[in-house]
């Protein structure tokens, strides 16, 4: 059907309007894509600008620090009032200095390291305490799993060390009520293998204190003054983590008696011991810092180290008697798969003069004999052969090294 002239014109105008609309819509989409792209570029540039501004700010702060005058490092003695502090600066001496308004006076505690301005001696920064990484490694992170129940034949020693170490830490009010000073330290001495280190680990387990273990040989350094510095930092770390226990094993390596003569190495060891004596006199017993020392040679220790006030109690660890050896055998054979009828008392009688470590070694050797014969249980014969192996005292054992290696 043919359309009239006006209708035909309206149809053509509608088609033209529809095409024009599609054209403008496509243009709008293109422009929108361009706007989105430019917006994304703008955001990226803003992020880069913020990053560069942060770098500039850090560089300005670093430049300001580099342009600042140097500071003196001192140690706080005590606070005089709300605005003044007594500070010890080595080697100049002690000074009463002002505290910067940005520093809270409550944060300025005795023995903390601070920075003083070079021109006015104003305290403007609190510094962290300086501790050698080697000293930090001496702190035992994991609490030892040894308990008093794992120690046999040392009931008297356990009671004494509880009175000196555990009781002051858990119940200091008892000593205040009696009006007596808390003990500072204890010395464990006796032959090797009698349980000194084991008892120290059990004390650390039951007191729930920071346990710092150090061997005396670790404090012997080749450079002058290094050993004394490590001793100072050891006690600084103990004060920071109080309540704490410092266990010094093999103390005879630095605590031997002083002689008139001696080489340079001996004088350095003596210097380390003098610093240890100074620290034992310097820190207060009420600060919850206890010292446990262990040695096999109490006869060579310096008398200045053993006097009361430094070492308040000396606990002897003798070789276990028959009953003690029986208790140790029961403890170490508790988890072993034993056959019925094993007479542990007879085994204890076969080991006169044996140490606790040797008794434990007998249990281990008995298990090795059973393992060698592909058995899953240990017999009385295994224990007897283990005793014969561990306790053999023939003539070869007493030979000198020179004869032994000929």
From Swiss-Prot:
| Localization terms from the record | Cytoplasm; Nucleus
Single GO MF descriptor: proteasome-activating activity
Residues with PTM N6-acetyllysine: 222
- Residues where Phosphoserine occurs? 120
Extract one GO cellular component term from the record.
Answer: cytoplasm
The chain's coiled-coil residues are none
Upon changing residue 60 to Q, the result is: In a colorectal cancer sample; somatic mutation
Give one Pfam hit by family name. AAA_lid_3
Question: Which InterPro entries would you find in this protein's record?
Answer: 26S_Proteasome_ATPase (IPR050221), AAA+_ATPase (IPR003593), AAA_lid_3 (IPR041569), ATPase_AAA_core (IPR003959), ATPase_AAA_CS (IPR003960), NA-bd_OB-fold (IPR012340), P-loop_NTPase (IPR027417), Prot_ATP_ID_OB_2nd (IPR032501)
Task: Kindly list the biological process annotations in GO that this record carries.
Answer: negative regulation of DNA-templated transcription; negative regulation of programmed cell death; positive regulation of DNA-templated transcription; positive regulation of inclusion body assembly; positive regulation of proteasomal protein catabolic process; proteasome-mediated ubiquitin-dependent protein catabolic process; regulation of transcription by RNA polymerase II
Which residue ranges does the record annotate as region May mediate interaction with PRPF9?
A: 186-406
Which residues are noted in the entry as ATP-binding? 190-197
Keywords tagged on the record: Acetylation, ATP-binding, Cytoplasm, Nucleotide-binding, Nucleus, Phosphoprotein, Proteasome
- Family to which the UniProt record says this protein belongs: Belongs to the AAA ATPase family.
* Quaternary structure and interacting proteins, as annotated: Component of the 19S proteasome regulatory particle complex. The 26S proteasome consists of a 20S core particle (CP) and two 19S regulatory subunits (RP). The regulatory particle is made of a lid composed of 9 subunits, a base containing 6 ATPases including PSMC5 and few additional components. Component of a complex with USP49 and RUVBL1. Interacts with PRPF19. Interacts with TRIM5. Interacts with NDC80. Interacts with PAAF1. Interacts, in vitro, with the thyroid hormone receptor (in a thyroid hormone T3-dependent manner) and with retinoid X receptor (RXR). Interacts with ERCC6.
Q: What does this protein do?
A: Component of the 26S proteasome, a multiprotein complex involved in the ATP-dependent degradation of ubiquitinated proteins. This complex plays a key role in the maintenance of protein homeostasis by removing misfolded or damaged proteins, which could impair cellular functions, and by removing proteins whose functions are no longer required. Therefore, the proteasome participates in numerous cellular processes, including cell cycle progression, apoptosis, or DNA damage repair.
- Name of the protein in question: 26S proteasome regulatory subunit 8
User: What organism does this protein naturally occur in?
Assistant: Homo sapiens (Human)
